[in-house]
Amino acid sequence: MSTKFVVFSDIHEHAVFSARALFDKRIFGLINSTFCRHGSYRMERIDAAIRAILDSLRPDLVIFAGDAVSTSDPREFESALKRLRPLIDSGIPILYSPGNHDRYVHARACREAFERFRAELTAHTPMTWPGLYETPDLRFAVIDCARPFNPVLSCGEMTPETADFLEAEAAKDDPRPLVCVGHFPLRTNGRSLAAYRHSLLGCKRAEALLNEGKIALSVVGHVHVPSQRLDARGRGELIAGSLTKKDVLREITFSDGVFTVRDLTTTGQPCPRA
């Protein structure tokens, strides 16, 4: 018995201008998207990735580790849904954990657009967060740690209830490994100001579960360069990297107690960085 899943993250649909963006954090996201990211985050890679997933990879499920958009403007969510529509319509289960850009601001229109996006994206796998998705040989704990923060922070925050959920699932007498699906890495990355700005607050209990092996694998996004800290059985934490920036899909196969990772380009071919 085996389970194969494909992971992608941080597609960052390009920001669009809104007059309301002048009065909240969206203006910073708009500037970043327009002047720093526009030429290097290539949206056509989403189309190529979906073709590869549907035509050749054919996984049992897909994990999207968040950041569909740049400033959470409703038009960005509409564009992202249009690009992702063939994957949604395929019926392949999609597990989605929101990113900080998906919950960028408190504006009502943006929050409502996010909820519509979430409902359509996960139409075949609806769940409340935190939630559990099960296959015959794996358990996937899907969490939501995205919150609007001030303009200088790109943090997430894990609630005590989410940590309780992970501890309860990890404590179950179940032989199937537990995979945590989130946007923000559980493992801390130093004590610098830059590390804090992108950190996951309140994650110490979850990080301990990962370090103790009670969470077998943490699958996340947020950091745009793909990486992983895995042991000989493929257990640990995998950072997907940005699909549109780095042209990478992560294919993970679980078989005989081992997670095997392949890095692929958006054409489905082996990634030269692997």
Feature-to-residue mapping (PLM):
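A short C-terminal boundary segment appended to hydrolase-like catalytic domains
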Residues: M1, D256-A274
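His/acidic metal-ligating clusters that form di-metal
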Residues: M1, I50-L61, R139-A141, L153-G236
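N-terminal active-site segment of His-dependent metallophosphoesterases
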Residues: M1-F77
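Active-site-proximal beta-strand elements of phosphoester/diester hydrolases
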Residues: S2-A15, N32, D137-P148, V179-V181, ...
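Divalent metal-coordination and catalytic microenvironments
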Residues: D10, V62, D67, A80, ...
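Active-site environment of divalent metal-dependent phosphoester hydrolases
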Residues: H12-V16, S70-R75, Y96-R108, P148-V152, ...
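Surface-exposed cleft-lining segments at the edges of enzyme active sites
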Residues: F35-R37, A68-S72, A146-P160, G190-A194
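Extended active-site neighborhood of metal-dependent phosphoesterases/phosphodiesterases
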Residues: S79-F165, R205, L209-N211, A232-L243, ...
